[in-house]
Amino acid sequence: MANIISLILILSSFLSCSKGKEIKPSSDVFRYIGRFDLTNLEKVKFAHSGNQIEFRFKGIYFEIGLNDMSSGGAEDKNYFSIIINGEVSQVVEGTPFLKYHKILVNSPDSFSSIEIFKRTEALCAVAIFHGIKFDEGEFKKKLAKKRRIEWIGDSFLVGYGNLVSIEAPPKGNPSSGFHAVNQNSYSAFGAITSRFLDADFSCIGFSGRGLYRNFDKSENGTLPKEYSKAYFNKGVEKAYDFSFNPHLIVIAIGKNDFGGELSKPPNMTDSIRFVKTYLKFLELITKNNPNAKIVLAVGGGLTDLTPRNLNRLSRFRSWVKVVKRLSDKYFSNTIGFFEFHSQEPPYGEDWHPTLISQQKLADQITPYLLQFMDW
């Protein structure tokens, strides 16, 4: 009798699995927005904050297959926002092994807009998309937006620690360290602004990275050195084909070059190297995006108040204005300049913007971009 029951359970399990359906990553129902590695269409790889997989779905639920190329530590894992009809419905936690995550839609009679949005940055882990499993339902491709914006930036752009709010000393201590679970690039200023402008969003951002040197004074893996890659992560690299073709590129980098000035004695930032590297970087950007308008953004995380007498914000501003003036002479692209207000407390992790501060950054730059682009 026990053997008969076991056989029935096995057959039942087989029949249940056999009626399931699957859509491979190669299906044309998927829109891949941002930098994706489509070399293997059975396992699509991506790493940057804000990489999106979009489609439309009519049905009750589906399951999305994902895994991380990582050990799964607290700093080395991904989180994904699942957006249904413009609202975040759930958050999926990445795993080092393939896992299918159930996404409840409850839309049996009409198509819903679905977006899988990578909220953690490239430094956390490369993600792999394995496709979708479902029992019943229909899928359609979403139409592309008419506008495309590429954002190039640092920890501010990728939402470092923005899900917490910590008072400045003596009430609190924002020097908390990085935790992937507290990072959400969907609620960072670049993504917020792009949604308001109804533009496809592509993000190339790395915490701690600078123009010619990084926050820790190292010069490996600076933003200009990583820009031409679809992703990089612990020795895994893939060149990018520049297929996004943005109408607008917003560059908000350079703050981390001043990180060495927090040392005692301060390791001063080299103005000549800063300007030369920025111009060389713009040469690369304009070569691959000859028709894009470009905005050079400063501010946000630097002030003239600390460290005393270094005037870091004023120097940063003046150097980028030199870059802008020379760029107008050297490049045919239309180039603008924008300055964010300095952030105020409370802070996210390690003195970064909170959700409220990120919204303020978006509110500041959005009117400027509307005018700059005549949108």
Report the location of each language-model feature.
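Sec-dependent N-terminal signal peptides
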Residues: I4-S13
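N-terminal secretory targeting modules
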Residues: I10, C17-I152, F156-S185
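Conserved SGNH/GDSL esterase-like catalytic core that processes O-acyl groups on lipids
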Residues: H48-G50, C124, N173-M268, I272, ...
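Solvent-exposed loop/turn segments at secondary-structure junctions
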Residues: S70, S155-V158, F206-L211, K255-G260, ...
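Structural recognition of the beta-strand scaffold that forms the well-ordered cores
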Residues: R148-I152, L157, F201-G205, H247-A252, ...
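Histidine-centered active-site loop/cap adjacent to the catalytic His
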Residues: S185, E349-W375
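Generic structural signal for well-ordered alpha-helices
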Residues: Y278-L282, V320
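Substrate-gating cap/lid alpha-helix
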Residues: V295-F340, W351, L355-L361
